[in-house]
Each structure stands twice: as structure tokens, then as C-alpha cells.
Amino acid sequence: MKEMDQRMSAYIQHNFMEKVSFVARESEGMSVQTTEQYMLVDCGMPADTFNIGVLRADDAGSEGAVRQMTDYFAARSFPMSLWCWEPLGASARQEIEHAGLSLAEVNEGMYAYAEDLSPEAYMPEGFAVKQIRTPGEVEQFGAVLSCLFGESSEAKHVSLYYERLAESQLWTRPEMALYIGVLNDGTPVTVGSTMRSRDSVGIYDIATLDEYRKRGFGSAMFHHILSDILTWHDGLIVLQASEAGAGVYKRAGFRPVCAIRVFENGHGIE
């Protein structure tokens, strides 16, 4: 990997680590462990959306780092997701396999500088995006995300996570912004979020309810968030793209720079 690509990959990882640890660092019943080799986030509930391990560097100690993270959640009987930036070496892969984790998704890490972006102004008729300003809207955000998991235990705990967040003041902090897309009748159908870190702003959680997909709502959410960011930020913007969303981000000016593999242990999953 080229030096420039390595640097951008590190920025993407750092912003992600800030995002997934932001609530846990200041919430009762949650915890964050950080070493030079990994970061572990325990949300205090059996939900792999928020119980996260990040392998920070694939080096001589990566095998032990993977083992420490997977053993921790196994002892708690909690599901977890393990996020690994490529290149991922053979020893880490072997330990991941030995721990019983399976590959759940592969995302593309992408970046762009504000000066290179020109968001589209298009907004579908009968649809609007707004930044969340009330505890009730935080709960709506969680309700949309939880619907992506059907009737599973994961869905219940995702909803509970945002109910607890709504009771705190963390969602009002400037580091994090939550957005919700609603229809004219007030029905929430799409969500998105941002996270500010030392070197970048990250875009996350772009998701639309199944029955409202293919109508441009997710794309409109992304471009609205991007427009908001550009009103106050003139530097680096990062995100992670699934295969389905990569095209929208590339057309907007984002460049792929790294692959991120997400593994899950499946403990507690219905």
C-alpha cells in the first residue's frame, strides 16, 4: 500500500474508532479498552452492532490481540463484530477462524477533501431530511435502524441503545450529529450520522427501511449530510461503503483506498 493510501486508511480507522467508542466512553454499563494493537467496545448489551473489536495493526502481536477480544466477548456470551483493515496477515486470519468468527461483510474505506466535492441539491418530492433536535427523534433514529434486523434480539437491543442515548445529553454534543429523513406525514424512513475526529469528519449509518428503498431517499440523505458538513468543514471527509452504496459515493467524488473486513461470532444471535 502506498504511503498516501496508508495515511488515509489510518484516518478512516481513527474516525471509526472515535465513532464506535463515543457513547460507550461516557455511558454507565459500557466500557472501552484501548491498546496499541486493538480497541474493544462493550455496550453492556448482547448486540454486535455496538460490541466491537478493532484490530488496529496487523503485526507480530495481532494473533494475541484477536484472541483477547474474542475471549472477552465469549466470556460474556455476547455477540461481537471484529473490524479488520487490509492487509490482514495469515496469523490473524487463522486466529479469527480458530475463534469461530465468520466473514459478515467487506466495506470499502473512502475519502475525499471538501474542496473536491459538490453535493447534489435534489430532494425527492414529499421527503425531507433534518438533523435530530429532540430525544424523541433520537428514539425514531433507533427505531429505523432496529427495523433492519427484523424481529431479532439484535433489533430489540439496537432500539434500547438509542432509547438510552435519548435519555443522555451525549447526542447533543458537537462531535456527533444524527439525521433523520421523513415523509410529509412525518413517517421516518431514512437515517444517517456524522462523527468529528481530530483529522476528519466521518459519515455513517446511511440506511433506509426496506419498503422505502429504490426511491432515492438514501442518496438524498447522503447529499444533505455532505452539504451540511461543507458549511463548517473544509478538510478531510471519510466513510465506509458497502457494495450497494459505493457507486453513489464514488460519483460524489470519494476515492476508495482500503478494504475493511467485518467478522462476527454469532453468539446470542437468533
Features from the language model and the residues they span:
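Acyl-donor-binding surface of acyltransferase catalytic domains
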Residues: A60-E137, L239, F263-N265
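A conserved beta-strand-loop-helix scaffold within acyl/acetyltransferase catalytic domains
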Residues: S153-L209
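Conserved acetyl-CoA-binding loop-helix of GNAT-fold acetyltransferases
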Residues: E63-T70, D205-D210, K214-S227, T231, ...
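Conserved active-site tyrosine of GNAT-family acetyltransferases
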Residues: I96, Y249, F254
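A short, well-structured alpha-helix characteristic of acyl/acetyltransferase catalytic modules
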Residues: P135-L148
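Conserved beta-hairpin
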Residues: V32-T35, Q94-L103, E175-T190
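A conserved beta-turn-beta hairpin within the catalytic core of GNAT-like acetyltransferases
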Residues: G44-N51, A104, R196-I203, R213
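N-terminal charged segments
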Residues: M1-R76, L88, R93, A155
